[in-house]
Amino acid sequence: MRMESLADRLDACQEKLLDLYEKDSNKLEDQILHWHYVRLENAMLFKARQAGLTRVGHQMVPTLSVTKGKAHKAIEVHLSLQGLQTSAYAHEPWTLQTTSLEMWNTQPQRCWKKKGRRLTVKFDGEDHKAVEYVSWGYIYVQSTETDLWYKVPGKVSYKGLYYEMEGQEHYYVTFAQEAQKYGETGKWEVHMGNTVIYEPCASVSSTQDAVREVSTAETAGHLRDNTTQTTTTPTCVGPTQTSTSVQTPPHKRQRLHRDREQQPDTTQKDNHKRVDSTDQWINGHRNSTETGDNCDSYSSPVIHLKGDPNKLKCFRYRLQHSVPELFDKASSTWHWAGGQSTTRAAFVTLWYVNVEQRKQFLNRVTIPKGIQATAGYMSMCI
């Protein structure tokens, strides 16, 4: 009779759970009721196993340790939701999924999370070492001191995933620890949509720690636009200096001026197509019969980066430490020191071994917002 009574009570409890599953409510009071019955179900199974029963009706009774562990978890979640019901967030939508045990145990543990979005961390900057994580839009945390509930936004930095509460940062995923498992160099990149967070540059203001990136497709389009508009004559420019300020001797500036006068307008040409050529320079001047991007054997494909000096320095630092194999040389930050240019913008020039290397660079690297990139060719006889 005792076993039959226990079986009836267990059946009634499980019927209530089925009703709640079918209801699929988004109200917190229904989720509290759900966990009340889960708690009751596990308590009955625990008592049955404690009494030596291995079956109640048609249901097998798990081991004592399993039923005890499930009962404790159900009590923990049930009490948490009861506390949440007294907060200002009780009338928000709460579903079976958002109040599940899996959600409770997901990092950050012992709190509730909503609006998760995936991000990818590329350890050592390599695609095959990419690991996905979830950054939460909102995290509901109960203060251990006051028992009050706080709704705080989830945040992402180069260091990891965290939230701030009562003036303190709480990291629940630390990428440095993850790098020990998935990487070798101790470096990584955080990719979140069109945003990429690189390693902060110590020599640059902290405001540059996280730079919003533009997608590769947008970067390529931007490069094409800039090349057409700003490099109407992608000439093989003479040697450039790598000091902070580029100052060319007067006679060399005159030579460059003569070279440009002898080149035809190439605004209607494909500025990205390079044709191999032999001796295109005659007595120090470029052969005027050559058109487009036909440069002499000393020319190399380059990209000129234009923008704020600090941002350029930081970006160059990141490139040198994350993808040094994707370019040949990088200049120091330089400025125009003469002529009619009044801009205060700085430049960094990247040299490439060949066009294919530059293409690989553009396919893998996104140009930060605020930095303008222009492709072209420069003489490398230095």
From Swiss-Prot:
InterPro entries: E2/EBNA1_C_sf, Nucleotide-bd_a/b_plait_sf, Papillomavirus_E2_C, PPV_E2_N, Reg_prot_E2, Regulatory_protein_E2_N, Regulatory_protein_E2_N_1, Regulatory_protein_E2_N_2. There is a cross-link at K306 (Glycyl lysine isopeptide (Lys-Gly) (interchain with G-Cter in SUMO)). Binds DNA as homodimer. Interacts with protein E1; this interaction greatly increases E1 DNA-binding activity. Interacts with protein L1; this interaction enhances E2-dependent replication and transcription activation. Interacts with protein L2; this interaction inhibits E2 transcriptional activity but not DNA replication function E2. Interacts with protein E7; this interaction inhibits E7 oncogenic activity. Interacts with host TAF1; this interaction modulates E2-dependent transcriptional regulation. Interacts with host BRD4; this interaction mediates E2 transcriptional activation function. Keywords: Activator, DNA replication, DNA-binding, Early protein, Host nucleus, Isopeptide bond, Phosphoprotein, Repressor, Transcription, Transcription regulation, Ubl conjugation. One of its GO terms (cellular component) is host cell nucleus. Phosphorylated. This is Regulatory protein E2. SUPFAM superfamilies: E2 regulatory, transactivation domain (SSF51332), Viral DNA-binding domain (SSF54957). Residues 258-277 have a biased composition (Basic and acidic residues). It comes from Human papillomavirus type 61. Belongs to the papillomaviridae E2 protein family. Residues 213-294 are annotated as: Disordered. Pfam families: PPV_E2_C (PF00511), PPV_E2_N (PF00508). Plays a role in the initiation of viral DNA replication. A dimer of E2 interacts with a dimer of E1 in order to improve specificity of E1 DNA binding activity. Once the complex recognizes and binds DNA at specific sites, the E2 dimer is removed from DNA. E2 also regulates viral transcription through binding to the E2RE response element (5'-ACCNNNNNNGGT-3') present in multiple copies in the regulatory regions of the viral genome. Activates or represses transcription depending on E2RE's position with regards to proximal promoter elements including the TATA-box. Residues 1-204 are annotated as: Transactivation domain. Residues 278-294 have a biased composition (Polar residues). It is found in: Host nucleus. Residues 299-382 are annotated as: DNA-binding domain. GO terms for biological process: DNA replication; DNA-templated transcription; regulation of DNA replication; viral DNA genome replication. The keyword Repeat does not apply. GO terms for molecular function: DNA binding; DNA-binding transcription factor activity; nucleotide binding. Residues 227-249 have a biased composition (Low complexity). HAMAP family: PPV_E2 (MF_04001). The keyword Repressor applies.
